[in-house]
Every structure is written in structure tokens, then in C-alpha cells.
Amino acid sequence: MAAKDVKFGNDARVKMLRGVNVLADAVKVTLGPKGRNVVLDKSFGAPVITKDGVSVAREIELEDKFENMGAQMVKEVASKANDSAGDGTTTATVLAQSIVNEGLKAVAAGMNPMDLKRGIDKAVVAAVEELKKLSVPCSDPKAIAQVGTISANSDETVGKLIAQAMDKVGKEGVITVEEGSGLQDELDVVEGMQFDRGYLSPYFVNKPESGTVELEHPFILLADKKISNIREMLPILESVAKAGKPLLIIAEDVEGEALATLVVNNMRGIVKVTAVKAPGFGDRRKAMLQDIAVLTAGTVISEEIGLELEKATLEDMGQAKRVVITKDATTIIDGVGNKSAINSRVAQINQQRDEATSDYDREKLQERVAKLAGGVAVIKVGAATEVEMKEKKARVEDALHATRAAVEEGVVAGGGVALIRVANAIRNLCGDNEDQNVGIKVARRAMEAPLRQIMANAGEEPSVIANNVRSGEGNTGYNAATEKYGNMIELGILDPTKVTRSALQYAASIAGLMITTECMVTELPKEDKPDLGNAGAGGNMGGMM
């Protein structure tokens, strides 16, 4: 076991504080409408330019191990805020830095660290309650666009795109961000249910100019099995041919003579038919087939529940207004499924998502909800260079997370105003003793830090603006972009309540732990000893002669 280096008391806290300040100072230059960029060097490729707090925090490793421990703990604040709300990482870092700096001053003055922490925790619990009272629901597209604009560093086109995407696919819909091919940002919406399986044979194509299959008002056969024997299919093919409608077969696989016969029938025009593989694998495939069945009012033909393909009738078929199939995707548009059945299926999947333990499972379940409930929107980010593309894509993703958080828990006045109002609302809060009261003051003072930092980045005098905002009422604040006072909600300067709440809670949690630290232990750096192996070998050879 390697030898350890141990530091106690003030020595440990001074080192830790230095690390906290190095990381926080690098992150906080990005805060606000006039925040600056940070350039990150990469071991390969071009440097990355970013205004995203968590991206900056993740890059920082300090040489001194004690300082690095302080930096890593603040990095945890940014990461937690990012994981919880998807934004607010810089605000969380600024709050944590302020609480740690003020808290350690109080500890140096002889306050009890445990009581300080209890006071800070008490203040944060009260502040979160006040924050909820200030929160305003965010549901109309204009407010959603404003939240997206603020989070994307005042980029209005991004805010509008996100609002359009949410309007198209609904609150439960999946919105993804991809790199586009042009200079302009684009929104691509896939309505209906789409899954990544294409036609099994190019001979099914009926729109050769686009290389797609388009079926109008088709019957949809869902089978949880491989189909290789055409005899099983004959009764249903005859029924579909008599009905004069096209048929889409979604099965585990269609192969051999079954596929060949379907292709021949399709080419001769006897029955218009297309076959695709079912999406997913194993249990997920069964679940997705059931989703399609609910969407199209069909039944999954599965031997597990005693249904056989030979005995299937038209009543077992699903139906949709239109189906479009490319070589690698199938889209079912306007399934005839019962709305209440679809809603109960969505509720069931939502419950599974809430109970899921892995992020991957949660993501897949959310995708299934989106496909049933609305659709999928893709925001394609346009930029002139790869460096700009990466920076812009990160901003759009942040803005998307912020708007989701806003829809979930509502919005409060932005620009650091909400935290100042909250700090004022809890001014009469008292602890059990004087040390706890100091902890409450530390937390209240920290709540001014985001506004002060926004002003410092804008080149204003933080103390003057903070005093003016503090003496104001309601949502009155200072717009650093236009350098004017006004009602932040009316000006469209909004912060999602969830983002502000998460930033405050995580900052206080980790800063409280740092204030109560009395000892730090790290490994001593190893000294690389010169390799004397070759010299020894030469000496031995000399002895042998």
C-alpha cells in the first residue's frame, strides 16, 4: 500500500479552497448574456470552444492532489445539476463557491462547522419552498421559446425551433439534436410511429423514384414468430385480396418460400403486400409489437397466447391511414387505435419508466411513449465549421433540457432575481443557536452570487445593481443584455424553477460537506527511480571474465 500525505484543519481547508476557486473561476466567466467563452485544448483535433459550465468543469484536473480534491467536489455539483435538470451548471458552481468561501471564513472565526451546515440546510429547505411559491406554469409556446432562447445564450432561432418541436410532438414526445449538413438550423418532424426496420425485399417498392413503399389504408398483420411456410399465410392473404386493401406484415422474420411467394404475388398485383421485421429484440420486441397493436387496433398473433397464423382473420388485423417504408425505417401514420387504449398504454409505460433503474431502459421506454403519444422531432444544427457545430450543438442540447425542466416545474424570474427574492423572503428565519444563524446568513448571501457574477461578466458594478434589485419588488430585475431594469417575466428572461432549485440544493449539499471537512488524505507522489538493471548486468559480465 502506497504511503499517504495527510493534512489537518486550516492547512487542509486552505488547499481545498484554492482548488474550489480555480475551478469555479474558470466556469463562472461563462454566466449570463455577456458571459465569455472558454477554449478547451484536446489531445487530438481542434480545440473546443464552449460556454457550457459542466463542459469546462469536466476538463479541469489540478496538479496538487489536495487542491484537486476541492476542484473535483465542485465538479460534482455541476455534474449533479446537469444530470438532474440538464442546465444550471454554472449557477450551481457559483453558489457552491460562495457558500464554501463564506462558510470557511466563519469556521476560521471559530464557528462550529456542524451548526453552520445545519443553518445552511435549514435556509435551503425554506428557500426551495419560497421558490415554488414564485413559480409560474410554463405551457404556451412563447414562454417555452423564451426559456430556450435564454438557455441557448440569447439565440432566438434555437428557442423558436424548440418551441415548434414541442408544439408538434407534445410534452411527451422525443426531441433529438443532430448535426445538420447546411448552415441553417432545421426541424424535421416524424409524425406517427416510426421504427428502424425497412422492407425485407426491394421488390416490394412501389415508388421507385424515391425507393419507398407507400400503402394507403392497409391491413397490418402482427406476428411474434418467424414465417417461412406460406401455407400458414394463405387464409389471411385470400381474405385481404377479397377486401381489396394492401397488407403490411410485421413479424420476427419472413424468409424462404414465404418471402418469395409474397414478392411474386405483389409483383403480379394479386395482393399488394410488404413485409418488415419487428423492431427490437427479445422482450423489448414483444412489448413494441404490443405497442403497434394498441396503436392500430390489432392483435399480436403469438403462439404463447394460443393464437395461430392459419386461424387469423381480418378482425385480428390492425389498420392505419397510411404506412411509408424505406430501406431502413417504417412509419405508421394515423393508426385507428382507440384513444383511451393508447392513453392507458402510455400510462403503463410511464410507470415502467419511473421504476426503471438504468438510464438506457428509461431512454428506451421514453422513446416508446413518444412513438405512441405524438412522434419524434429532430433538430438539425447548422454551422460553418466543425468547431462552431460542436459548440452550437451543446448549446441547443442545454436549451432543450431547460425547456423540458420549465414545462415540468414552471419558471421563475431569470437573471438571478428569483434567488434574491427568495433570500429576502427567508430573512426572518432563525436557527437553534447563533452558529446556525450564521449558516443561514451564509446561504442567503450566496443566493446573491449568481446576479453579482452576471453583472461582473457584463462589466457592471455588482454591488450597485444587487442593491437596486434587492430594493425592488416582484419580478423587477436588471437585464444585462440591454442594460435596463424591468419585469423579468415580461421581458422573457426566465429560468426553469427546476434548474434554479437543483442548482441551490446540490451546491448547498456539497459545500456543506466541504465546510465540515477537518482532514484530507491523499497518496504521496511516487518518485521515479532510474532503472539500474543494465548497469548491473554489465557488472556481472565483467566478473565472469
Swiss-Prot record:
What the entry lists under PROSITE patterns is as follows: CHAPERONINS_CPN60 (PS00296)
Q: Which UniProt keywords apply?
A: ATP-binding, Chaperone, Cytoplasm, Isomerase, Nucleotide-binding
**Which major enzyme category is it?**
isomerase
InterPro entries (alphabetical): Chaperonin_Cpn60_CS, Cpn60/GroEL, Cpn60/GroEL/TCP-1, GroEL-like_apical_dom_sf, GROEL-like_equatorial_sf, TCP-1-like_intermed_sf
Q: Which residues bind ATP?
A: 30-33, 51, 87-91, 415, 479-481, 495
This entry's Gene Ontology molecular function terms read: ATP binding; ATP-dependent protein folding chaperone; isomerase activity; unfolded protein binding
Q: What are the GO BP annotations of this UniProt entry?
A: protein refolding
What is the E.C. number? 5.6.1.7
Q: Where is the composition biased (Gly residues)?
A: 535-545
**Annotated spans, Disordered:** 526-545
- What protein name does the entry list? Chaperonin GroEL
The record lists the organism as: Blochmanniella pennsylvanica (strain BPEN)
List the taxonomic lineage: Bacteria, Pseudomonadati, Pseudomonadota, Gammaproteobacteria, Enterobacterales
